[in-house]
């Protein structure tokens, strides 16, 4: 008798196994977990993610989308839906609302989200307005460095900066590591003038914060502000009313005290511009990462989509994205708040 037939005879068939002996069904080939054992443990402890229930949870969210929003044009891939479950600690209802908000925000602010691709933002990327540091912090968070002083308002509108921020966040959130660990923002306000600050008025502030808090699947663990001038008090006065208490408590204002910054972000991961030992600030590497992702962004953000009203309705938009009339964003109104700092 052949080796093959011996194997067939001696191997137990599925039918001969009792129910308790049946092997667990294999995970679909569409998703392969890339988390390390430590991150699996962290996700379990902080996000209530149980590996043995992961695909069941994804399927539950997928079923909810199909039932409650059958016409929603969205990816239903395991990896994509996991972003929203992790961002809302595997609460199905909150994850569904976040997913709906995510698409509502994209469709309600076309100036930012239409044609969102790296090649359309080469001027912003070349300016050095933002980058991602090459090293993560001790908690594994990527550090997004934003430098408003690099922006020249006469070159392009502030919405281009916002587009670059969301482009970066979209790229970062593709990583399961980032989905679990979150990100840290390092904002350097050195040299920000009154005229430049006035472009970031209440309406834009409310829209940006509304998306970050309620319309994007990312965990912001801390915002470190350095070199802020006196004018920043006015900027923060504009921002703070729209911040949830949890996020507001994660803002740290260091001024020019880099020692204070180093108690939160070690010098070993910071460039020398911020008293670190990781060399000069490099923006070219992250720009190259984004530009190499051009095809992914074209596929995701440069295709025609139905309007927000026809599928989701304005009532589902996060606060701050429902009506332009909700905030007076005139230059005079903004400057009056900023002048109060002096």
From Swiss-Prot:
GO terms for molecular function: phosphatidylinositol bisphosphate binding. Keywords: Transport. Residues 8-19 have a biased composition (Polar residues). Residues 117-282 form the CRAL-TRIO domain. Residues 1-31 are annotated as: Disordered. It comes from the Eukaryota. GO terms for cellular component: membrane. May act as a protein that binds a hydrophobic ligand. This is Alpha-tocopherol transfer protein-like. It comes from Pongo abelii.
């Amino acid at each position: 008798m052949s080796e093959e037939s011996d194997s067939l005879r001696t191997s137990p068939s599925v039918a001969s196994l009792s129910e308790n002996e049946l092997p667990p069904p294999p995970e679909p080939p569409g998703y392969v977990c890339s988390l390390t054992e430590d991150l699996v443990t962290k996700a379990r402890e902080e996000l209530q993610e149980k590996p043995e229930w992961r695909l069941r949870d994804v399927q539950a969210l997928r079923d909810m989308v199909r039932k409650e929003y059958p016409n929603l044009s969205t990816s239903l891939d395991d990896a994509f839906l996991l972003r929203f479950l992790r961002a809302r600690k595997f609460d199905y209802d909150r994850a569904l609302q976040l997913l709906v908000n995510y698409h509502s925000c994209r469709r309600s602010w076309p100036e930012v989200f239409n044609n969102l691709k790296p090649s359309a933002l080469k001027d912003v990327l070349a300016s050095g307005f933002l980058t991602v540091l090459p090293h993560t912090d001790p908690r594994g968070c990527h550090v997004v460095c934003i430098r408003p002083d690099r922006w020249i308002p006469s070159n392009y509108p502030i919405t281009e900066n916002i587009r670059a921020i969301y482009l970066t966040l979209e790229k970062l959130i593709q990583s399961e590591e980032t989905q679990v660990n979150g990100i840290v923002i390092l904002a350097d306000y050195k040299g920000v003038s009154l005229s430049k600050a006035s472009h970031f008025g209440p309406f834009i502030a409310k829209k940006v914060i509304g998306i970050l808090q309620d319309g994007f699947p990312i965990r912001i663990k801390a915002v470190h502000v350095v070199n802020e001038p006196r004018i920043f008090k006015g900027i923060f006065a504009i921002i703070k009313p729209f911040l949830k208490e949890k996020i507001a408590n994660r803002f740290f204002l260091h001024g020019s005290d880099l020692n204070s910054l180093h108690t939160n972000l070690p010098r070993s991961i910071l460039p020398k511009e911020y008293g670190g030992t990781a060399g000069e600030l490099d923006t070219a590497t992250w720009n190259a990462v984004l530009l190499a992702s051009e095809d992914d962004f074209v596929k995701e953000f440069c295709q025609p989509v139905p309007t927000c009203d026809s599928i989701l309705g304005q009532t589902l938009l996060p606060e701050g994205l429902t009506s332009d009339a909700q905030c007076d964003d005139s230059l005079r109104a903004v400057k009056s708040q900023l002048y109060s700092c002096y």
